[in-house]
Amino acid sequence: MMYSPICLTQDEFHPFIEALLPHVRAIAYTWFNLQARKRKYFKKHEKRMSKDEERAVKDELLSEKPEIKQKWASRLLAKLRKDIRQEYREDFVLTVTGKKHPCCVLSNPDQKGKIRRIDCLRQADKVWRLDLVMVILFKGIPLESTDGERLMKSPHCTNPALCVQPHHITVSVKELDLFLAYYVQEQDSGQSGSPSHNDPAKNPPGYLEDSFVKSGVFNVSELVRVSRTPITQGTGVNFPIGEIPSQPYYHDMNSGVNLQRSLSSPPSSKRPKTISIDENMEPSPTGDFYPSPNSPAAGSRTWHERDQDMSSPTTMKKPEKPLFSSTSPQDSSPRLSTFPQHHHPGIPGVAHSVISTRTPPPPSPLPFPTQAILPPAPSSYFSHPTIRYPPHLNPQDTLKNYVPSYDPSSPQTSQPNSSGQVVGKVPGHFTPVLAPSPHPSAVRPVTLTMTDTKPITTSTEAYTASGTSQASRYVGLNPRDPSFLHQQQLRICDWTMNQNGRHLYPSTSEDTLGITWQSPGTWASLVPFQVSNRTPILPANVQNYGLNIIGEPFLQAETSN
């Protein structure tokens, strides 16, 4: 696929633009520029264009050089790319090009949380809604800038407020539109000498001739032709319309909706972002695509060689399911596994930290983020209502991979967000752990409250909130697989315990408290025990107890199966 260098400059040469450019309809350039010309004429002369002048402008725009149209479309696609969230750009390309089942594509919201409006011709005083632009560009439907209220989202759309998927955007058709469609159809059949025109019963009444006046300058055949023709027509790159799959323009909302989807189609759930989106930041071109044999960006070379790259065995796919699941359906789990210290949406007044690791991905010769994740398989994660852990955690890893070492010589201040602050976008391998403890002079209480009626391998999830220190850490507990028990010793006299209203302390100077959990990097079943004989301090029938750890509890660790 070769494009004229006049059309695509170095800034506009991008896989996103090259993939979508052949699917932009030719009417888009003519329609947007015609509306701008009419608006400019009205502001200058304070009167509307005559039909002859408007028709002359239309003919001029239709006969414009293909390179000019292509350059305008490429600039508009570059602007749309910035307004689409980065994690949805690949899906947008694959769905528009017909290589993937249509799924929701979310855009960056405006300051009010609504869908954005952009100027399509570098005119600050004339803006169009993103969904309107998508319908005009990729469906060729001539809509006015005030037709936003006529747009409706498909029943398959899960986020109607911000979705800009062209296949999910439909135009509501009213009774007047249906009546006009019938009238125009009868007019065309009469002009073409159809036999039905000779039937008086099927001829439109005479009063309809004076009831409608065509205000536009496009006739029906011309409008349909330019709405189906790609904008790259005439540049040596012709794409048959039949090869571009799309949903029908008209959809009867009163008819039954078939919600069944193909079994081979991937789910439409996407991983949300945990960091605020910088709207002015321009991401790297390599941060948008993950090449696959069916993807437009299949290879590290130029876009023209993607046909040769189709046979490459390397497959890069985006994860179709988040690594972690959240209790709230609205608050999906983030990619990064270290949470900031805030209140959990499902449990008021409670925050928690998660320790997780990911194995580094294999090296790839492609200049794209190497975060290949297989499609969803039967889950072997640990069962937890709040936290899910990857199944590839290595049980042979020692605790030093999960618990940071503490250096008293390095001063640290206790800040609210220092314990679990997300550190930017990490596309590849990362090993987030709990942040080091604050300065030794600062008190670091860890409140653990649980209900335990079984041995140390099981416990029931419970939470408590501490309103004293901002450096407090809260840990959620839940039953775990009893395999791979790990024990952690605590410093002498670094703990106190509240058992049914009674405060317990170390009995002797050799009394050292230990805690037990299972699987590296997971918090579960924290039960105090005596290190000397490894017996639980509390009997099995104790209902409630709290454990306060003050200072730096993590000193040494030993593993026992």
Swiss-Prot record:
**Low complexity bias located where?**
408-421
The sequence motif named 9aaTAD is recorded at 397-405
UniProt GO MF annotations: DNA binding; DNA-binding transcription factor activity, RNA polymerase II-specific; RNA polymerase II cis-regulatory region sequence-specific DNA binding
* GO cellular component labels: cerebellar mossy fiber; nucleus
SMART domains, alphabetized: DWA (SM00523)
Sites of the modification Phosphoserine?
264, 292, 295, 312, 328, 333
Q: Which residues carry this modification: Phosphothreonine?
A: 286
Please report which protein family the annotation says this sequence is part of. Answer: Belongs to the CTF/NF-I family.
Q: What is this protein called?
A: Nuclear factor 1 B-type
Organism from which the protein derives? Mesocricetus auratus
Tell me what gene encodes this.
NFIB
